[in-house]
UniProtKB/Swiss-Prot annotation:
This is Telomerase reverse transcriptase. GO terms for cellular component: chromosome, telomeric region; telomerase catalytic core complex. Mg(2+) binds at residues 837, 999-1000. Telomerase is a ribonucleoprotein enzyme essential for the replication of chromosome termini in most eukaryotes. It elongates telomeres. It is a reverse transcriptase that adds simple sequence repeats to chromosome ends by copying a template sequence within the RNA component of the enzyme. It is found in: Nucleus; Chromosome, Telomere. The gene is TERT.
Length: 1259
């Protein structure tokens, strides 16, 4: 069934970016639609236009609309302004004036003059607090820059002529306009800055509040239980002290005590009562310190009274009814013998029973109100003696055990219940003594952990420190004062600070057996854990499970601390010492060591039974084998663990104690609630076990890092092995490039804190030092220097020689060369290619030479950098983020261009009006400090780099390209020109193509002699520049004679076609066609190149597949000017082959993903459509921004057919897992089966001989 085409919009107008849609809502419109929204609604055709009144034959904007605004023959820039620029109209509730009345024509002023006058008017009004981006670029002398130039172009002049002066002034002053800079990037030119709008309370109330979690406050149930017991005790004391008083005085006394107790429980206030002057019959009682005032009438009104919502009033009415019923039941209980009070209290209780008094308490969000009867002013009070003995004080409050984790929640209801737990006097006396049982505190006051909470792995990476203690000094197990068992219990289970004082060795032995009581068993086990952690012999366990002697080469072992060098000398010794790069511990060894430590430290019952131990060890192994950027959630720590695996946890009886009876009556607890409490205790224990035991043990004994050749796989090097590796690497660097600082220079460096930290990254045979230059003080200056150098790169590319910085530059150069040499290629002349790589390119750069090059390149006396803010939208979270970015404006005072750091993701750039001027001397000083005074901190020592530039800085690639560009211009270009003249060739057209990506050279020529001379020249090196080639990375497709290098990077597939790999590309040595280089996957596993999210949804899987396809959708692979139709389809087929392999690795890693086969099929099909659309979109972008006109000859049906064939071909190798999926894919392929029979290029693309390397991949 053919796919339906989307409807086109009737009226012109583009889409509004999501950032502006989220910030302004429906007020964000395209500029054309925004202009029409300022006009009155159109009238009927019979009535004349009120603006032009029919005097203009062609009509006006009010009556003709789009026909007047957009006309035939308008420039493309003007149409783009009307249909793609976005305008946000001011809201009605703001202080913006109404739009002016439209009148056709204008006063004859130019757009530039109108903008200048408008800027002066806005600046004059800025004293009132108004802000406008249009005036951010206004100098003190009144000269406009940047933004004013953007809104004074010829397109804006056309718009002024068609909408008039008044509407143009209103647009510039009262609206926010955003101009398209790139496909997905916009630049604000008028209105309140978008970053200021995002901080506006109005925006926060309408947008941000929807996405920020609401923090509700509720009280800790255990605290209420304890404090309510204190309140009941105060009430009972009040009875004894008021046996001779009248009922009214006793009533007022009880109310005072109740209020004071409630105030200690939390923020519970008495509601606003009637005025004391309106007939209050209560006697005055001066016990609260306010003599002469009625304590019943006195209220502390903290805020204005407001009427309750309807649902709250209905709930309040229900509570009054329930209290009436409960008062009847309490009157029955008063007649029973279940009363603990004796003496005068009993007589007082009898008197109170005859009067049938009761309390009605209602609570809303702000206050605790006492309801009075309308017919009489008599206040009903419950017998305080009965409340203190029969009714649980906890039942006064609405205790919800499922939320009792935080002490900052607010009560929603406080009421008396109609029933009370029937418990014995001894249990109540225990509660009234202000102590709660151990079980209830652990189960109700423990922190609640979500299964989605993350276990932080950042602590295990790149830790070089060697300590004698496994746990760091701030760890609870390594404090000088050994923690007691209760302190560790509070730490493990996260007991709330307000409940920590209640946790004691206390339980109700009469109701709970000692064998099942946490109070009797858990502290004893925790004591054993503390003692075992001090006595465990970690080092012996480490040497037993993680021995590396068998992996270390015998020629690198030390003998009495002295190195015995082999015949090759020190260099050969250092080369052989790097065999220790393979002396890392495997994942199984690390997991075995961690498990051995746990068995020595943790008591056996806390590890669970045999099934629990097996599951826990499996989860530890999963944690150890995670890749670099993968996350580990609490649900992954739990895995298959169950409460039944832990006898001490499954046998806890929560319902036998007095505390749990009270909570059960209030919350209606059931078996499921008790199981949830047990699970929460298990979650707290397992989370602490991983965070505070497993991670510190791994961090102490291993240096955890990734390797350059193994992508995201994580390697665990023992600290002793890593110390040897880094010492050898530092020794080699110290011998060549670095000098250690001692004495006064070291003290000065430590005082100024101007050093950069270094970490080493293992390579295949040596170590690469990476410098961290992301400190804020350095990063800001480096950003400015980077922008200035980038501007030089754009204005004077010849100073960088043949440098290319991305595939777009390669595409541009290669397309021009092939178009000029099309005739030679058609004749199938031999093409000669040479590839060379500079050895240690960054380490051999001469400081004095690169500084001299900088002096010659940067001639301007002053550079200007302008500050911008960028607002981006996170589509997955539907929220906005803002961060600062720099925009290079120009050189000196001649500032008319705007060079913004654009991004493919898109965003909104807002000019901040902040200009930073950098003088030439200041710029040279910054670069001098970066190059000559680069101080690195390795361990506890400081090193000064004497030769080379640091890797890891933004400036390093540009400085390196400038250095080798100078080498090309001064040496290589002269050499190639002289050899060409000696050969007698014409000099009109270039006979060769030279490109360089930082330090990787490629030379293409149709002359064998020319290619041989270039190869020989590169092999000799360049002594003056301290530049030599790497002998193991040469590549050439011809016979080099007797002096042929020992290695050649030429790749030849099963089809016999030779390719030259260079910078991620495979270049056909016969036709110069381009394919992607997948040879780097031959030595690694495919799964090591992906990052898996354990609990992935269908949407997330689709995003990952699209992410895998994105790098292989560059136009250089699908341009018909470079590649043949067969090669284009081979590139698509190979991209889908790799994506299918990563798809299998991802689905295999997410074994618990509940995704059906049909959903996966839809995800795969959407990936095909996404790739084709992305190819088309990037083709258009290259044509727009580069001087390249690519040609795409590819249909969507062919892309889908190639994708389905690639998935079937890959998943057939895993047939047992994807039997149903293969059936669905085959059925889907049947809809396009005619393409495979009709198109020869498709059959050529899916031939296995053209993709022979893929069948050698491990996935």
């Amino acid at each position: 069934m053919p796919r339906r085409r989307r409807r086109r919009r009737a009226a012109p107008g583009g889409q509004v970016p999501p950032e502006l849609r989220l910030a302004y809502g429906a007020r964000a419109l395209t500029l054309g639609r925004a202009v029409f929204s300022l006009l009155p609604s159109p009238r009927h055709c019979e009535s004349p236009c009120p603006a032009c009144r029919g005097r203009v034959a062609s009509g006006c904007l009010a009556c003709r609309r789009w026909e007047h605004l957009l006309r035939d023959g308008d420039p493309v820039a003007y149409r783009r302004l009307i249909t793609r620029a976005v305008c946000a109209i001011a809201a009605d509730d703001l202080s913006a004036p109404p739009p002016p009345r439209y009148t056709p024509g204008n006063s004859g002023h130019s757009q530039a003059r109108l903008v200048r006058e408008m800027m002066k008017s806005i600046v004059a009004d800025q004293s009132h607090g108004t802000k406008n981006v249009l005036c951010n670029g206004l100098h003190e002398g009144g000269q406009s820059i940047c933004i004013s130039d953007l809104v004074s172009s010829s397109s804006w002049s056309i718009l002024l002529h068609r909408i008039g002066d008044l509407l143009m002034c209103y647009l510039l002053r009262c609206t926010s306009i955003f101009l398209p800079v790139k496909k997905n990037d916009y630049f604000q030119v008028s209105g309140v800055p978008l970053n200021v709008v995002l901080r506006n309370p109005i925006f926060a109330s309408t947008v941000a509040r929807k996405h920020q979690p609401q923090t509700t406050k509720a009280k800790c149930h255990t605290c209420y239980l304890w404090k309510s017991a204190n309140m009941a005790e105060n009430l009972s004391i009040c009875h004894d002290s008021s046996n001779s008083g009248v009922n009214s005085s006793f009533s007022s006394t009880c109310k005072i005590v109740t209020q004071q107790s409630c105030e200690t429980c939390g923020s519970i206030r008495r509601a606003e009562s009637k005025d004391p002057s309106e007939g209050c019959n209560c006697p005055k009682f001066p016990s609260d310190g306010r003599s002469g005032e009625c304590c019943n009438c006195y209220t502390h009104n903290t805020r204005k009274r407001k009427r309750l919502y309807s649902w709250q009033r209905r709930s309040k009415k229900k509570q009054v009814c329930s209290v009436d019923e409960s008062s009847a039941e309490w009157s029955k209980l008063n007649g029973s013998n279940f009363n603990m009070s004796n003496g005068p209290s009993e007589n007082l209780a009898g008197k109170m029973n005859d009067q049938a008094q009761s309390v009605e308490l209602t609570v809303d969000n702000t206050s605790l109100a006492r309801s009075n009867d309308d017919s009489s002013s008599e206040i009903k009070v419950i017998n305080a003696t009965i409340l203190s003995s029969e009714k649980s004080p906890c039942s006064v409050f609405d205790i919800r055990g499922s939320q009792g984790l935080s002490c900052h929640y607010s009560l929603s209801e406080v009421q008396y219940q109609s029933t009370c737990p029937q418990v014995g006097p001894s249990s109540y006396l225990h509660l009234n003594s202000c102590s709660i049982c151990f079980n209830c505190i652990i189960s109700n006051a423990s922190k609640h952990l979500s299964l989605d909470s993350l276990i932080s792995r950042n602590g295990i990476f790149y830790n070089r420190r060697t300590t004698y203690s496994v746990f760091h000094c701030k760890h609870i197990l390594s404090k000088r004062k050994r923690p007691d068992a209760l302190s560790l219990v509070k730490h493990i289970f996260g007991i709330n600070s307000c409940c920590a004082s209640l946790l004691k060795y206390n339980c109700h032995e009469s109701t709970i057996r000692k064998s099942n009581c946490l109070c009797c068993w858990l502290p004893k086990s925790i004591k054993n854990l503390i003692r075992n952690s001090k006595r465990c012999q970690y080092k012996k366990l480490f040497l037993k499970h993680c021995s590396v002697k068998c992996k270390v080469a015998p020629d690198v072992t030390k003998n009495d601390g002295k190195a015995h060098y082999p015949p090759g000398g020190k260099a050969a010794y250092y080369d052989r010492s790097f065999s220790r790069l393979e002396a890392y511990s495997t994942h199984q060894q690390v997991a075995s060591f961690v498990w051995a430590v746990l068995k020595r430290i943790v008591p056996k019952p806390l590890l669970g039974n045999s099934f629990g131990k097996r599951s826990l060890r499996t989860n530890i192994w999963k944690f150890i084998k995670l890749r670099r950027f993968e996350t580990f959630q609490l649900s992954d720590c739990i895995g298959d663990l169950k409460v039944s695996h832990y006898s001490w946890l499954s046998n806890i009886e929560f319902s036998n104690c007095f505390c749990s009876a009270i909570i059960g009556k209030q919350t209606g607890s059931s078996t499921s609630a008790e199981e949830q409490k047990q699970k929460n205790i298990l979650h707290c224990w397992i989370s602490w076990l991983f965070s505070d035991i497993v991670i510190p043990v791994v961090r102490t004994y291993f240096y955890v890092t990734e390797r350059e050749s193994k992508r995201y796989d994580v390697f665990y090097y023992p600290k002793s092995v890593w110390r040897d590796l880094t010492s050898n690497a530092i020794a080699s660097l110290n011998k060549k490039n670095f000098r250690i600082l001692r004495g006064e220079p070291r003290k000065a460096v430590r005082h100024l804190n101007c050093s950069s930290r270094v970490r080493f990254l293992p390579k295949a045979k040596d170590m690469r030092p990476l410098v961290d230059l992301r400190a804020k003080s350095k990063d800001a200056n480096l950003n400015k220097c980077h922008l200035i150098m980038k501007k030089l790169r754009d204005e004077k590319p010849e100073m960088f020689g043949s440098s290319v910085f991305d595939y777009n530059n390669v595409h541009q150069n290669l397309s021009q060369f092939i178009s000029s040499k099309r005739s030679q290629l058609m004749k199938k002349l031999k093409v000669y290619i040479v590839v060379a790589d500079v050895s240690k390119a960054f380490d051999c750069v001469s400081h004095d030479m690169v500084l001299k090059m900088i002096d010659d390149a940067f001639k301007c006396d002053e550079y200007t950098v302008r500050k911008c803010s960028k607002v981006i939208c996170n589509r997955s979270k539907n929220s906005l983020y803002r961060f600062d970015s720099n925009a290079s404006i120009g050189n000196g005072n001649s500032i008319y261009d705007l060079s913004i750091q654009l991004s493919s993701g898109g965003g909104i750039f807002v000019d901040q009006g902040t200009i930073c001027r950098i003088l030439k001397e200041q710029f040279h000083h910054l670069l001098y400090e970066q190059i000559k005074c680069n101080i690195l901190k390795i361990g506890q020592k400081y090193y000064l780099q004497q030769v080379g530039i640091a890797q890891g800085s933004k400036l390093s690639p540009n400085l390196c390209s400038l250095y080798y560009g100078h080498l090309e211009n001064s040496v290589l270009s002269k050499f190639l020109h002289d050899s060409k003249l000696n050969a007698g060739e014409a000099f009109s057209e270039p006979e060769y193509l030279l490109m360089r990506f930082i330090d990787d050279f490629i030379f293409i020529s149709f002359s064998l002699e020319h290619a041989q001379k270039f190869l020989n020249r590169m092999r000799r090196g360049f002594v003056f520049y301290n530049c030599y080639m790497n002998d193991s990375k040469y590549g050439f497709n011809f016979c080099a004679g007797n002096s042929e290098p020992s290695s050649n990077r030429l790749y030849r597939g099963d089809d016999g076609v030779s390719f030259m790999p260079w910078s991620g590309l495979l270049i056909n040595c016969e036709t110069l066609e381009i394919q992607a280089d997948y040879t780097r996957y031959l030595d690694i596993t495919i799964i090591s190149t992906i990052t898996v999210k354990m609990h992935s949804s269908t949407k997330y899987i689709h995003s990952k597949l699209c992410h895998y396809m994105r790098p292989k959708c560059h136009p250089i692979f699908y341009d018909s000017n470079i590649n043949s139709p067969g090669t284009i389809r081979v590139n698509i087929y190979q991209a889908f082959l790799l994506c299918a392999m990563k798809f299998h690795c991802y689905i295999r890693s997410v074994s618990d993903a509940n995704v059906s086969k049909l959903e996966l099929l839809q995800v795969i099909k959407r990936t095909f459509r996404y790739m084709h659309s992305l190819i088309v979109r990037r083709m258009q972008d290259v044509e727009l921004h580069y001087n390249v006109r690519p040609v795409l000859k590819l249909r969507r049906k062919e892309t889908i057919w190639l994708g389905l064939t690639a998935y079937i071909r890959v998943l057939q190798q895993k047939q047992s897992r994807y039997k149903d999926m293969l059936t669905l894919l085959t059925a889907e392929l049947g809809r396009y089966c005619h393409l495979g029979h009709e198109c020869d290029t498709l059959r050529y693309a899916v031939d296995d001989s053209h993709s022979s390397m893929f069948w050698k991949f491990k996935f």
